[in-house]
From Swiss-Prot:
One of its GO terms (molecular function) is ATP binding. This is Pantothenate kinase. The gene is coaA. It is found in: Cytoplasm. The keyword Nucleotide-binding applies. Its EC number is 2.7.1.33. InterPro entries: P-loop_NTPase, PanK, PRK/URK. It comes from Latilactobacillus sakei subsp. sakei (strain 23K) (Lactobacillus sakei subsp. sakei).
Amino acid sequence: MKNEMNYYEISREEWRYFHGRGEKYTAITDDELQQVSGLNDRISLTDVSDIYVPLRHLLQMKYEQFRENQIKQSEFLEIKPHKTPFIIGIAGSVAVGKSTTARLLQLLLSRVYPDKTVQMITTDGFLYSTSELKQKGILDKKGFPESYDMPQLISFLNAVKNNVAPVKAPKYSHQIYDIIPDEFDIIDDPDILIVEGINVLQLPTTEQIYVSDFFDFSVYVDANPSLIEKWFLERFDLLLDLAKDDPTNYYYPYAISDRASAFKMARRVWRDIDLRNLNDYILPTRNRADLILHKTKHHLIDKVFLRKY
């Protein structure tokens, strides 16, 4: 274990032993793992036991501390304890595997807390719709800070944190590459909420309250940009395969066109939009996370950085 300035750097070999010996753990199956895995994200049951079970154990500790602190504060104020959800933020680049991490943690925490409600949302639902982005003249900056309705996202999190149930979160579809009109995810009195998105650790200058102010723990999924580009293009290839027989799919025109031309467009999107967004707005938030999962080739997590204080 290396002792960095703000983080403990822990190798995979060391981290795998921090799983909470003797604690009840309900194993997940290969089929369940495939259901939570994102497109082109490679993960195995070994990854679950080596990386995610210790992380689940850490989150259990944090959650129990959080609940105890809530009770003590209520006693201090001489008020009835108010149920407040424990919120976990998960950040990182596009195509790095945030969604897989979020869904897997939701599954693991649901297993260890079968009597608790563990829900998850993605901040993609708080992007402005394509029509709104066009009106604002920022369609080419989709994913950048200005493309999100941050007041709506902050209002949503404030309602969740104050246990104003149920709360609606807009739904986003990668199939149509837009907000789904009149469809919502309902967040109803969760004990634990996982919020996943590229922007969850950002500090917009236009806001006085930040998304991360509502988090009780945060995770950043990290990898070398050259690897993320590779995963981005591999995912794009899979999206084209899935879209080739569906004219309603956003990727259908690219799927039925010349594949080389489609990839030329995808590389341009990565270079001009996603890489720039990563370097300018996402990567600078990495050191605000409580824990960093560092990935190497084939999505293998080789080390973990845990914030000291």
